[in-house]
């Protein structure tokens, strides 16, 4: 494709259950983006989604005995400004670890 094609703004939304893994992925993306000379806004922390699950410990009676588990989904938003096709190609080459979800939007 033509490398002169530009997108005025490209939003990357990252989600993960592990915040350290999410931060390492963000560092990789920032290094690649700075190497291609693309302006970057962020990473902006978004609200963490907290999901609490309560189960009864006993299989029979004793409903007062319960156990709670929680699952936190950490989210970040990065906005890339004036992205060309070469920048998008370099973003596609990044190895994203298992457990991190990326979503791109204009």
Curated annotation (Swiss-Prot):
SMART domains: Ribosomal_S10. One of its GO terms (cellular component) is small ribosomal subunit. Keywords: Ribonucleoprotein, Ribosomal protein. It comes from the Bacteria. HAMAP family: Ribosomal_uS10 (MF_00508). Belongs to the universal ribosomal protein uS10 family. Involved in the binding of tRNA to the ribosomes. This is Small ribosomal subunit protein uS10. The gene is rpsJ.
């Amino acid at each position: 494709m033509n490398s002169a094609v530009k997108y005025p703004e490209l939003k990357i939304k990252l989600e993960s259950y592990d915040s350290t893994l999410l931060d390492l992925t963000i560092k990789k993306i920032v290094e690649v983006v700075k190497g291609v000379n693309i302006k970057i806004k962020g990473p902006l922390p978004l609200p963490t989604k907290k999901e609490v699950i309560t189960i009864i410990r006993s299989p029979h009676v004793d409903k007062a005995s319960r156990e709670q588990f929680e699952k936190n989904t950490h989210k970040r938003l990065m906005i890339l400004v004036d992205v060309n096709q070469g920048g998008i190609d370099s973003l596609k080459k990044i190895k994203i670890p298992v457990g991190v979800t990326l979503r791109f939007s204009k």
